[in-house]
Amino acid sequence: MNVLFVCKQNAGRSQMAQALYEGRGGNARSAGTTPASRVHPEVAELMPELADRVPKQLDTVDAEWADIVVTMGCGDACPVIPGRRYIDWDLQDPAGQDVEMVREIRNEIERRVAELPL
C-alpha cells in the first residue's frame, strides 16, 4: 500500500506521519502545498531523525503514486486524483507549539497511522 501524507508546509504533521508509517514497514511519501524551507524545529527536537529532511512540494505524480492520500489541513489546495482513497485528519499544526503539545500531536498521528493498512 502506498500512502501519501500531505499538509501545508510538509514540515511537521506529514513528515511525522511518513516516518511513523515507514517505521511500521509501509511505503510512504509526504509533501506540502506550500513547503517550508526546513522541518519545524519543534518537530526535529522531538523526532531528531527528521531534522535533515527537506520539505517537498506536492505534485500530481505523488498523488498518482498513492493508493491512499492522507490530508492534514491543506484544504482545497490538495489535488484530487480519481480512484484514490482520501482521508482527512483534523490535527493541530505543531509549528510554534511547546514540546508537550508536539508530543501529543505526534502520539495522535502514531495512533492513526497504526490504523492504516500496510
Residue positions per predicted region:
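Short polar/charged helix/loop
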Residues: 1-118
